Amino acid sequence: MTPMDALKGKTWNLVQFDDGSPVQAGRPITAVFEEGRISGSGGCNRYSASAASASPGALHVGAISATKMACMGPAGTNEQRYFAALEKAEGYALEEGKLTLSPGKMTFKATTP
């Protein structure tokens, strides 16, 4: 069993940024954890990156590769903000069905595919 096993098998939907602002309706931002990887939607573009955890609660996300669809307005701003925060992630916490990535305190709720 690896430290990130509890994150796998679910689609994590971003529900709130660190400042409490919600994600734009109709433009879901998602994260799916697989062995050594994270992928999902930034709201406009699909992305993937390496992801590793040396111990429970620790997280390292590598450089993000994403499709290059044009993304204007609030959706584009949210996507850029999400990608920047995701690349800086150093830890995670699971509590009552919610995933929080930090620093940056992005909060996700899980759905099963």
Annotate each predicted stretch with a short phrase:
Residues 1-113:
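Lipid interaction determinants
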